[in-house]
Amino acid sequence: MKTPLRYPGGKSRAVPKLCQWLPENITEYREPFLGGGSMAIEMTKRYPDIPIWVNDLYKPLYLFWLALRDDGDYLYDQLIQLKQRHPDQGSARQLFLDAKEKVNEDDLSYKD
């Protein structure tokens, strides 16, 4: 499985190199800057039985990953419906621009 997100500064191409430096006996993994999640996804494949903690300061991104983890089937169904309601490139682009504007308007940094 690859990350469903393209993320600036992502680690997807660096994962093989990073994994060369992992210690032999890993008992947990913590990812403070989740982003596109490439390294965390790789760790779940390599070490399916260890606890994995992830975090990201950018709330929309963090909430996306929570939704994918906790309710992936529902998220998938919603995305399919969006695609059906916006079948052409122009409509899909406008949906993207509207969503981008909404995200940029709100202060969505996670501050608890």
Write out the residue ranges for each language-model feature.
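S-adenosyl-L-methionine
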Residues: 1-34, 38-39, 46-47
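Broad hydrophobic/π-residue packing in well-ordered secondary structure
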Residues: 7, 29-33, 40-41, 65, ...
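Class I S-adenosyl-L-methionine-dependent methyltransferase module
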Residues: 45-46, 50-112
